[in-house]
């Protein structure tokens, strides 16, 4: 688990100003056991900073995502953004079509990102491949149909 000093150093290394909301948001994303949505992050941040506004959390998430300190995930058709601290590695996500649960899926190919190779790059310098697998989670698979 990272400490407040670690989060402050992460912000400085990314040339971001160290603020209490940014440190609290980093802590909330890193402390989450799974990809956290914005409401979960806001609740977590408010445990330490009860006066923090929704906008301060959204602004912090935007800055942290732009600086590649957190990763934003928003599967197609989802209105909810989720954030994770697992960045810069070869992993993707699987999403349950029924309940929306999301889990990490490691790439089968080891090495640096991207783990997939495009058949044509059209002159782009590709540095990431985003794959979302869709299916039904174990809980929904055994749930009785309505």
Swiss-Prot record:
Main localization category: cytoplasm
Pfam families assigned to the protein according to its UniProt record, in alphabetical order: FUR
Places the protein is found: Cytoplasm
Keyword Lipid biosynthesis part of the UniProt annotation: no
Keywords assigned by UniProt, alphabetized: Cytoplasm, DNA-binding, Iron, Metal-binding, Repressor, Transcription, Transcription regulation, Zinc
Chain sites annotated for binding Zn(2+): 96, 99
GO CC annotations, alphabetized: cytoplasm
InterPro entries to which the protein is assigned, alphabetical: FUR, Fur_C, WH-like_DNA-bd_sf, WH_DNA-bd_sf
Transmembrane stretches, start-end: none
GO biological process assignments: negative regulation of DNA-templated transcription; regulation of secondary metabolite biosynthetic process
GO molecular function, one term: zinc ion binding
Family assignment from sequence similarity: Belongs to the Fur family.
Function field: Acts as a global negative controlling element, employing Fe(2+) as a cofactor to bind the operator of the repressed genes.
Protein name: Ferric uptake regulation protein 2
Species for this entry: Mycolicibacterium fortuitum
Gene from which the chain derives: fur2
């Amino acid at each position: 688990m990272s400490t407040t000093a670690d989060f402050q150093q992460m912000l400085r290394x990314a040339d971001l100003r160290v603020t209490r909301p940014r440190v609290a948001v980093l802590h909330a994303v890193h402390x989450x056991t799974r990809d956290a949505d914005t409401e979960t992050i806001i609740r977590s941040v408010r445990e330490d900073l009860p006066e923090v506004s929704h906008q301060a959390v959204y602004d912090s998430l935007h800055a942290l995502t732009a600086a590649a300190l957190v990763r934003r995930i928003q599967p197609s058709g989802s209105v909810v953004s989720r954030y994770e601290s697992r960045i810069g590695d070869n992993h993707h996500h699987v999403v349950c079509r029924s309940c929306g649960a999301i889990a990490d899926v490691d790439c089968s190919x080891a090495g640096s990102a991207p783990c997939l190779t495009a058949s044509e790059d059209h002159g782009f310098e590709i540095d990431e491949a985003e794959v979302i697998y869709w299916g039904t989670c174990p809980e929904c698979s055994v749930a009785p149909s309505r």
